[in-house]
C-alpha cells in the first residue's frame, strides 16, 4: 500500500491511517463529521416504475469532510506553533531595568529562564499569569523558573520583591539561596541577599518558608528572618515587644540558654503564641514543657490537646492547637 501522507506527518499518523496514539482534537472532529460520511447503499431493489436515481452525494460529502478535517488540523498545528512561550508580562517599568536582551520596557515578556535586574531608584511590576502582581524593587535581580498551570516560580537572586497573589495555596513560589517562600494566598514582601539572608513580612494571608525539612508559617502581620546557614527563623508579630524580638534572634542563632528563653516567655502576649508554637519544635524537651505551660497560661488548652502529646510533638495534635490559636491572631 502506497503511503500518501505528506512529509512531516509522522507526528500526526492518527489523522492519516488511525494508527499511533489517538489525537483528541482529531477524534473530536471525526465525531462531529460522522453524520456526513459516505454510507454504501443497502442492497434493496427499488420499485421499477418509480425508481429514481439520486445524485451520488455520499462521495462528495466525504470529500468535503476530508477537506474540513485537513483545514482544521492545519489550524491546530499553526495555533500550536504560534502559541507564545510561557512567561510573565511586564506591566510597568519605572527607572532603569535590564534583561539579557537589553533595556526592559513595559509590555515585554519575562520568559521562563529569563531574568531582569533593576537599577538605582527603579521598580518593575510583573503580572503573574492571572494570579496577581510581583513588584521588583531597586537593585534587585530575579529570574523566572517556571510558569505552568501547576506552578509559578520566581527566583530572587538578591534584592526585594513584593507579591500580591490571589492564587490557590501552593501554586506561587519564590526561591532564594536559603529558602522557598510558599504562597498560601497572600501579600508579602521578601528581602534577600545573594547568600539568602533576609526577611519576610506578610501583609495578609499566610506564607510558609521551607528549607531542609524546616517550615515556618507566617500569618498576616507576621515577620520571619531567614539565615543562609540555618534557613527560616521563628516567626513573630511586628508589634511584639522589643525584648522578645531580640531574645528570639539569639535563640535562632543557637542560644538556647535558660535566661534567653525566660525573656521570650515573660514578654509573650496571647498573640505571641504564634512564636511559642514554633519554639516547641526548636527547644529541648525540658524547655518544651516550659513553653507549653506559658502557652496554656496565655490561651488555654483546646479539647483533644494534651501535655504529653505536645511534648512528643504529636503532629495532628499540634495542628489542632494551631487551628485553635490562629483565630486570636
What are the language-model segments listed below?
Residues 2, 49-51:
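Short loop/turn segments at strand-loop or loop-helix junctions that form parts
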Residues 28-37, 44-49, 56-87:
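Single-pass transmembrane signal-anchor helices and their membrane-water interface zones
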Residues 34, 38, 74-115, 119-120, ...:
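Flexible, surface-exposed loop/linker segments and immediately adjacent secondary-structure boundaries
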Residues 2-6, 10, 56-59, 100-101, ...:
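Acidic, Pro/Ser/Gly/Ala-rich intrinsically disordered segments
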Residues 1-38:
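Short, charge-enriched, intrinsically disordered boundary segments that mark the beginning
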Residues 289-329:
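C-terminal non-catalytic accessory extensions
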Residues 7-9, 270, 314-315:
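Intrinsically disordered, low-complexity regions enriched in Ser/Pro/Gly/Gln/His and often acidic
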Amino acid at each position: 500500500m502506497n503511503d500518501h501522507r505528506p512529509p512531516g506527518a509522522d507526528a500526526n499518523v492518527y489523522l492519516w491511517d488511525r494508527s499511533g496514539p489517538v489525537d483528541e482534537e482529531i477524534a473530536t472532529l471525526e465525531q462531529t463529521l460522522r453524520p456526513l460520511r459516505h454510507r454504501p447503499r443497502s442492497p434493496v431493489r427499488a420499485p421499477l416504475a418509480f425508481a429514481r436515481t439520486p445524485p451520488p452525494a455520499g462521495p462528495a460529502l466525504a470529500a468535503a469532510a476530508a477537506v474540513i478535517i485537513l483545514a482544521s488540523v492545519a489550524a491546530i498545528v499553526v495555533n500550536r506553533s504560534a502559541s507564545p512561550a510561557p512567561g510573565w508580562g511586564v506591566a510597568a517599568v519605572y527607572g532603569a531595568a535590564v534583561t539579557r536582551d537589553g533595556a526592559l520596557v513595559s509590555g515585554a515578556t519575562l520568559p521562563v529562564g529569563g531574568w531582569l535586574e533593576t537599577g538605582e531608584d527603579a521598580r518593575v511590576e510583573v503580572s503573574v499569569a492571572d494570579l496577581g502582581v510581583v513588584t521588583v524593587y531597586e537593585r534587585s535581580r530575579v529570574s523566572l523558573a517556571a510558569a505552568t498551570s501547576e506552578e509559578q516560580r520566581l527566583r530572587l537572586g538578591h534584592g526585594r520583591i513584593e507579591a500580591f497573589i490571589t492564587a490557590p495555596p501552593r501554586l506561587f513560589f519564590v526561591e532564594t539561596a536559603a529558602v522557598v517562600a510558599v504562597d498560601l494566598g497572600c501579600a508579602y514582601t521578601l528581602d534577600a541577599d545573594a547568600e539568602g539572608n533576609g526577611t519576610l513580612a506578610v501583609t495578609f494571608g499566610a506564607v510558609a518558608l521551607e528549607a531542609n525539612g524546616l517550615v515556618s508559617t507566617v500569618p498576616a502581620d507576621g515577620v520571619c528572618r531567614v539565615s543562609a546557614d540555618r534557613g527560616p527563623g521563628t516567626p513573630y508579630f511586628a508589634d511584639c515587644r522589643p525584648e522578645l524580638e531580640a531574645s528570639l534572634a539569639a535563640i535562632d542563632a543557637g542560644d538556647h540558654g535558660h535566661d534567653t528563653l525566660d525573656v521570650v516567655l515573660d514578654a509573650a502576649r496571647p498573640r505571641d503564641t504564634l512564636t511559642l508554637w514554633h519554639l516547641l519544635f526548636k527547644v529541648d524537651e525540658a524547655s518544651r514543657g516550659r513553653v507549653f505551660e506559658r502557652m496554656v497560661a496565655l490561651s488555654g488548652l483546646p479539647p483533644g490537646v494534651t501535655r504529653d502529646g505536645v511534648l512528643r510533638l504529636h503532629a495532628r495534635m499540634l495542628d489542632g492547637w494551631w487551628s485553635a490559636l490562629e483565630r486570636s491572631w
